[in-house]
Amino acid sequence: MAAAAASLRRTVLGPRGVGLPGASAPGLLGGARSRQLPLRTPQAVSLSSKSGPSRGRKVMLSALGMLAAGGAGLAVALHSAVSASDLELHPPSYPWSHRGLLSSLDHTSIRRGFQVYKQVCSSCHSMDYVAYRHLVGVCYTEEEAKALAEEVEVQDGPNDDGEMFMRPGKLSDYFPKPYPNPEAARAANNGALPPDLSYIVRARHGGEDYVFSLLTGYCEPPTGVSLREGLYFNPYFPGQAIGMAPPIYTEVLEYDDGTPATMSQVAKDVATFLRWASEPEHDHRKRMGLKMLLMMGLLLPLTYAMKRHKWSVLKSRKLAYRPPK
C-alpha cells in the first residue's frame, strides 16, 4: 500500500513535489523558502549594535555645548573690554558715495581734493607714484594737465656739457617732492618724517574714514594729559600725539568751482582724492564687474539649457540586465 501511494504521488505532483508548501527541491538549500526575503522582526531590530545616544550622553553633550558658548562669549567680552580701555579711537564708517556695489568715485571731489593737496599738503607730503598723466580723463583734460605740469620746474639732464638743467614739467613727470631726501624732511619737521600719500588710504586701517577722522579730529588734550612742545593731541592717531599741526580749517583755500571750503568739505575732498590715488582702477574694476554680471546672466541660462539637452536623455535611460542564454 505504501509503495502504491508513493507511485500515485509521483504521478500527480511530479518527481520534485512542485506545489506543496514547504516542499524542498533537490540541490537548493532551504527549498522554496530560501528565495523569500528575510523579515526584520522587532526582536532583530532591538539586537542592532548602533543604538541612539542615551539620555545621560545627551545631557553631557548639551552641557559641553553651553560651556563652549559661554567661554566664547566671555572671551569676546574680555577682548571688547581691553579694546575699549585703549585711548585710541577707531574711525567711524562714513557714508561715502563710492561705497555702493556699483558706485563710482566722485570725480568733481577728486578735482577739488587735488587742489587741496597741491595748495596745502604738498608742502610736506610727497606722492612719488602719481604722475600728471594719471589726472587726464579723471579730473582734468589733457590740456589742463599739461598746464599743471608746466607750472613745475623739473631737474633733467645731463646736457651735452654734462650738467643738469631745469625744464618745465611734462605729463610723464611725477609729482615733485617737497624735500630732496628723508633727512631734510626730518630736519624741517622736528624729527618727524611726513609719509608719502600715494597709497596712504590702502596702508591705513579704516581707509578714507581714517584720513577724514584724522584731519578733523584735532582737539585739546584731556585733563591730566601733557604733550611736549611741537606735538598735538589727536585721538585717532596711534599714541594720540602727532607732530603734524592741524593742516585744514574752514576757508583754508578757495575752490575754483566756488564750493564753500568748510573743514568737513576739505577733508572729504582730499580723502576722496587720496582714495583714487591709492586705487585708480576703482571705477574700471566695478565697470568690469557689472559687465561680468551681465554676461553671467546670459551664459547661465544657456549653460543650463545645454546641460538639460545633454543629460536629460542619459538621466532617463534605464539599464536592463539580460543574462546570456
Curated annotation (Swiss-Prot):
PROSITE patterns: CYTC. It comes from the Eukaryota. It is a single-pass membrane protein. Gene3D superfamilies: Cytochrome c-like domain, Cytochrome c1, transmembrane anchor, C-terminal. Heme c binds at residues 121, 124-125, 244. It is found in: Mitochondrion inner membrane. Its cofactor is heme c. Belongs to the cytochrome c family. Component of the ubiquinol-cytochrome c oxidoreductase, a multisubunit transmembrane complex that is part of the mitochondrial electron transport chain which drives oxidative phosphorylation. This is Cytochrome c1, heme protein, mitochondrial. The lineage of its organism: Eukaryota, Metazoa, Chordata, Craniata, Vertebrata. The gene is Cyc1.
